[in-house]
């Protein structure tokens, strides 16, 4: 079966098949090697890419900008303070304007419906840099990183996600593992599992790929024998302090600490995090939480001991955001 990623959107990974995902991963590997060896060739000369950020970002913005610059493209950063989006101009109208000026558009924001609307009206490829429901560029980086740190083929790699599995990370880790035939475990309170219809959709993908999907409320069952443990923050900047109590009490059993990571029985288990992480109280939010919950001063979703240990590969994971995003840009806009 042939395929062509030229001018394709990247909105959730639902519409990308396993062969296309593997191609993007292989291309990211090749582009990373070329950058490291100084042999990279620009394929995006005279291309212009708009970066819409309704949510702030460090890694996603830097990854898109560096990936584009490395390949010879120009970018324009657009945030709510510097545009009329949502104030005087709808996303539909914004899409129709930007689509006439740019070769592609990246969007990082809130509802998946917004990025879908942008893609419907822009007439150029649209890339989802993060929505409440999905984080596809992060998934490519995560699988690339797991590949680099395992001598197993993808279908033999086992990984777990612990925490609030209703969010974009929980959804997306379940989805990409189901597509690629991997062994995926979700460890979370049942009330924080992905939506039932989404689980059913992933189970259908798993039936085709041979993936093994496990959802459990027992964190130790989730991580038994895994090669990688993923997590994400439990609370976000801007959430009312009153909302923290219920969330933290529900998720405390899923904290990634030395006891839990050693319970895998696998001395090669690695820890992954999409970042930022509250692994200490050196940030504004971390400090606020530590003041309210003194027992979490050394880490919330992950302890500082684990985060600063050799098991943690979160920063390689962060670097791979740039290489995988570059693969998306080149395959979509570079005509290869």
UniProtKB/Swiss-Prot annotation:
It holds the Pfam family OTCace_N. PROSITE patterns: CARBAMOYLTRANSFERASE. Pathway: Amino-acid degradation; L-arginine degradation via ADI pathway; carbamoyl phosphate from L-arginine: step 2/2. It comes from the Bacteria. One of its GO terms (cellular component) is cytoplasm. InterPro entries: Asp/Orn_carbamoyltranf_P-bd, Asp/Orn_carbamoylTrfase, Asp/Orn_carbamoylTrfase_sf, Asp_carbamoyltransf_Asp/Orn-bd, Orn/put_carbamltrans, OTCase_ArgI. GO terms for molecular function: amino acid binding; ornithine carbamoyltransferase activity. Its EC number is 2.1.3.3. Transmembrane segments: none annotated. Keywords: Arginine metabolism, Cytoplasm, Transferase. L-ornithine binds at residues 168, 232, 236-237. It is found in: Cytoplasm. Carbamoyl phosphate binds at residues 57-60, 84, 108, 135-138, 274-275, 321. It catalyses: carbamoyl phosphate + L-ornithine = L-citrulline + phosphate + H(+). Reversibly catalyzes the transfer of the carbamoyl group from carbamoyl phosphate (CP) to the N(epsilon) atom of ornithine (ORN) to produce L-citrulline. This is Ornithine carbamoyltransferase, catabolic. The lineage of its organism: Bacteria, Pseudomonadati, Pseudomonadota, Betaproteobacteria, Burkholderiales.
């Amino acid at each position: 079966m042939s395929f062509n990623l030229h001018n394709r959107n990247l909105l959730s990974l639902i519409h990308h098949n396993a062969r296309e995902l593997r191609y993007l991963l292989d291309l990211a590997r090749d582009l990373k090697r070329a950058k490291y060896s100084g042999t990279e060739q620009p394929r995006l000369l005279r291309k212009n890419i708009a970066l819409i950020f309704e949510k702030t970002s460090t890694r996603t913005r830097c990854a898109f900008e560096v990936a584009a610059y490395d390949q010879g493209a120009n970018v324009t950063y657009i945030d709510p303070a510097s545009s009329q989006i949502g104030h005087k101009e709808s996303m539909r109208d914004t899409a129709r304007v930007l689509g006439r000026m740019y070769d592609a558009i990246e969007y990082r924001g809130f509802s998946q419906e917004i990025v879908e609307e942008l893609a419907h009206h822009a007439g150029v490829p649209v890339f989802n840099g993060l929505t409440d429901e999905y984080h596809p560029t992060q998934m490519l980086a995560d699988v690339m990183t797991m590949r680099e740190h395992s001598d197993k083929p993808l279908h033999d790699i086992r990984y777990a996600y612990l925490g609030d599995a209703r969010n974009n990370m929980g959804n997306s880790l379940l989805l990409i593992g189901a597509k690629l035939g991997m062994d995926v475990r979700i460890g979370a309170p049942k009330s924080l599992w992905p939506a039932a219809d989404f689980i059913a959709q992933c189970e259908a993908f798993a039936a085709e790929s041979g993936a093994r999907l496990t959802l459990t409320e027992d964190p130790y069952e989730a991580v038994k024998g895994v090669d990688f443990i993923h997590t994400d923050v439990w609370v976000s900047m801007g959430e009312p302090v009153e909302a923290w109590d219920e969330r933290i009490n529900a998720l405390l059993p899923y904290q990634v600490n030395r006891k839990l990571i050693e319970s895998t029985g696998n001395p090669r288990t690695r820890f992954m995090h999409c970042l930022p992480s509250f692994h200490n109280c050196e940030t504004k939010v971390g400090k606020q939480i530590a003041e309210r919950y003194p027992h979490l001063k050394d880490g919330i979703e992950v302890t500082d001991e684990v985060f600063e240990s050799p098991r943690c590969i979160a920063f390689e994971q962060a670097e791979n955001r740039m290489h995988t995003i570059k693969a998306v840009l080149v395959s979509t806009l570079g005509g290869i």
